[in-house]
């Protein structure tokens, strides 16, 4: 199923979200408990304002995302380029690529899997250690040579974003 949004707005008294872009959705069922949902598109923009002020403005380019759910949990894979800005982050441009799909059990955090996030001059590989911890491997020059490694609770990573 294909969708094309042109300035679709969702609004409340204090917030407004604007959606622009294209998205293709695919759905598959391999068994009674095995379901896959995939989203893809060339460009999709989400802009959020609160009381007239910009909260965030994200554009995903060349995106692919899929989630497979079974009775045991689910796996997720994402690949996209993100261009974003907000009052706290100006003109961030990163490429996100799944190295190995993130595997989730009963918890909200993945128990395994890794993704690579590449910016202008550096990259970080984010690897799920378990449902409680995540490891960050920083390549300061973005050449794959690890210059710093840090393991932390998922909550700490989430709060830093």
What kind of region is each of these model predictions?
Residues 1-161:
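Low-complexity, intrinsically disordered segments exposed to solvent
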